[in-house]
From Swiss-Prot:
Protease is among the record's keywords: no
UniProt KW Metal-binding keyword: yes
Name of this protein: Adenylosuccinate synthetase
Catalyzed reaction equations: IMP + L-aspartate + GTP = N(6)-(1,2-dicarboxyethyl)-AMP + GDP + phosphate + 2 H(+)
Top-level EC class as recorded in UniProt: ligase
Binding of Mg(2+), residues: D13, G40
Any GO BP: IMP metabolic process
Annotated active site: D13 (proton acceptor), H41 (proton donor)
Entries under SUPFAM superfamilies matching the protein: P-loop containing nucleoside triphosphate hydrolases
HAMAP family found in the cross-reference section: Adenylosucc_synth
Organism: Geotalea uraniireducens (strain Rf4)
Organism lineage: Bacteria, Pseudomonadati, Thermodesulfobacteriota, Desulfuromonadia, Geobacterales
Family per record: Belongs to the adenylosuccinate synthetase family.
Binding-site residues for GTP, renumbered to this chain: 12-18, 40-42, 306, 332-334, 414-416
Length: 431
């Protein structure tokens, strides 16, 4: 038996959706443990592209239980829309396989309005929030002002808490942000209607997980965003508001650290980032544009063009360290196929010093310049390759060099967006 955590090893958008989709075949439960609809998983099934923001990728596999844990903040409107769309496409029929933690926190309308207004008023200090209300919802969770799913399902409790919290939120909206306040009735009526649908999926998911673990079932924990966006371990303040690292799989679901056997970090064969913040290997030239165009680097959630750059070994070394990675899934190797030469960042130059580890100080990180080594490209189509041995020699050398620099084995290589365009070197569920 093995239970596996999948985390982003960079700044998000690494291709976790595809890898989770592949690993789901070997799991019984797929569990989402943090974030909200600020993340987007893009899956290509046959000729169809499916984007999921909240519901775990495992929903596309029959007989798999999908759980959204207590660490997630849920926008009911988005959740219901995803269910409706999946059902319309014939991808989801059995309500019983999808469970919501009764303890997860709800994104309220005032969270979204506050989020958008703050970002608009931030000027040069914008962090690049998606405006989905994720940060303000987590603020209220930590500040003990949050409304949980169990509260929403009880009209008396929901009414009491909404009245209690709305006065403060309206003060912030009107007096500090210059925005329109909400009436109690407009929120209460809208969210009470959502509750009627949500109650069909609610469960004590921590208990369900432990029962499944006791029964010997295999669990796959699905993270969102990436290590460098973790609220504690990321490039603060240019981070998300949740624990994106492997430890979040426990706090966000109620699973024990002893239940985790394998931790797989997902990394592109290059690097991308959305929003503001330091990015030493960013390319603002023809190579960067080529990566963006060839890799289709536009956000699944926002549609924003992603910043693109060469592979940064220091970022991956850091992800290996703070997550305890047991393996790396390398994605989008095929995107590099047209490059005559490829660069790898092996260190940083800072004030005439050479750094071989990621600096914790943001001011230092922002001033770091990449130190590169260069490798020849393979300049051939690899999307039809299904074994490591079949890869061009120069592609194999590139993968081996990344593995060496990361200090962690590469256990999967993605050579295209489709599910079958994958080379699995080691199955973590059989470890």
């Amino acid at each position: 038996m093995a239970n596996v955590v999948v985390v982003g090893a960079q700044w998000g958008d690494e291709g976790k959706g595809k890898v989770v989709d592949i690993y789901t075949e070997f799991a019984d439960d797929v569990v989402r443990y943090q974030g909200g609809n600020n993340a987007g998983h893009t899956l290509v099934v046959g000729d169809e592209k499916i984007v999921l923001h909240l519901i775990p990728s495992g929903i596309l596999h029959q007989g798999k239980r999908c759980i959204i844990g207590n660490g997630v903040v849920l926008d009911p409107e988005v959740f219901i829309r995803e269910i409706t769309n999946l059902k319309a496409k014939g991808k989801f029929q059995d309500d019983g396989v999808l469970l919501l933690s009764e303890s997860l926190h709800i994104i309220m309308p005032y969270h979204k309005r506050i989020d958008i207004a703050r970002e608009a008023n931030s000027g040069a200090k914008k962090i690049g929030t998606t405006g989905r209300g994720i940060g303000p919802a987590y603020e209220d969770k930590i500040g003990r002002r949050g409304i949980r799913l169990m509260d929403l399902l009880d009209k008396q409790v929901f009414s009491r808490k909404l009245k209690e919290f709305l006065e403060e939120k309206n003060f912030i909206l009107e007096k500090l942000l210059g925005e329109r306040p909400f009436t109690f009735e407009e929120i209460f009526d809208e969210y009470s209607a959502y509750a009627d649908t949500l109650r069909n999926y609610v469960a004590d998911t921590t208990l369900v997980l432990h029962q499944d673990l006791k029964a010997g079932k295999k669990l796959l924990f699905e993270g969102a965003q990436g290590t460098l966006l973790d609220v504690d371990h990321g490039t603060y303040p240019y981070v998300t508001s949740s624990s994106t690292c492997a430890g979040g799989a426990c706090t966000g679901t109620g699973a024990s650290p002893r239940d985790i056997n394998e931790i797989i970090g997902i990394s592109k064969a290059y690097v991308t980032r959305v929003g503001s913040g330091p990015f030493p290997t960013e390319l603002e030239d023809a190579d960067g544009e080529k990566l963006r165009h060839t890799g289709g680097e536009f956000g699944a959630t926002t549609g924003r063009p992603r910043r693109c750059g060469w592979f940064d070994a220091l970022v991956i070394k850091y992800a290996v360290r703070v997550n305890g990675l047991t393996g790396i899934a390398l994605t989008k190797l095929d995107v590099l196929s047209d490059f005559e030469s490829i660069k790898i960042c092996t260190g940083y130059s800072y004030n005439d010093k050479f750094l071989n580890e990621l600096p914790a100080n943001l001011d230092v990180f922002e001033k770091c310049r990449p130190v590169y080594e260069e490798m020849p490209g393979w300049q051939s189509d690899i999307t039809g390759v299904r074994s490591f041995e079949e890869l061009p020699e120069k592609a194999k050398n590139y993968v081996k060099r990344l593995e060496e620099l990361a200090g962690c084995p590469i256990v999967l290589v993605s050579v295209g967006p489709r599910r079958d365009e994958t080379i699995m070197l080691k199955n973590p569920f059989e470890a």
